[in-house]
Curated annotation (Swiss-Prot):
PANTHER family, per the entry: NUDIX T16 FAMILY MEMBER, TUDOR-INTERACTING REPAIR REGULATOR PROTEIN
Compartments where found: Nucleus
Cysteines joined through disulfide linkages: none
Main localisation: nucleus
Cited InterPro entries: NUDIX_hydrolase-like_dom_sf (IPR015797), NudT16 (IPR054754)
Protein name: Tudor-interacting repair regulator protein
Gene: NUDT16L1
Amino acid sequence: MSTAAVPELKQISRVEAMRLGPGWSHSCHAMLYAANPGQLFGRIPMRFSVLMQMRFDGLLGFPGGFVDRRFWSLEDGLNRVLGLGLGCLRLTEADYLSSHLTEGPHRVVAHLYARQLTLEQLHAVEISAVHSRDHGLEVLGLVRVPLYTQKDRVGGFPNFLSNAFVSTAKCQLLFALKVLNMMPEEKLVEALAAATEKQKKALEKLLPASS
């Protein structure tokens, strides 16, 4: 049985986050998703479509960015960034999902917002994003997260988790899928274990054989 577990960051409340001193930076990101009744190849349930994006640095993340609390509320700052990368969406405090403290030398609190759209609305966001100011610059394109696992137990979500993610994005994705009941925790653990094993094997192939 796999010993892999869903990684977790230190969660704090929104009120606690707002009380943090000026030495802390605030990042705000949005997870947009929609129920998807479709089937891949006519047999693999899609279940949900979740949007992430490929960034300028080659890392995957959610739409959003840093918010200067001296000039903007969390939501106003987030909407300003979303306007540059998506072009046609405004989130509110009602969409707030969580705040987590990041690990490492930089003092950053990461806020995540989540909004469920219809599949048609989600597709409209994808179309609008192509015409946004940051498309092809800071944002290289939106991607849908494959929330299924194929028969080989690697294709789909495990392969997706093998990609490189920016900062807290991977942990935020797993957290949101869990708390929004979009994927059972045991399925998250299985996908993580498969992704870790794949990465381990890939690394072993790159390393020279020991003499």
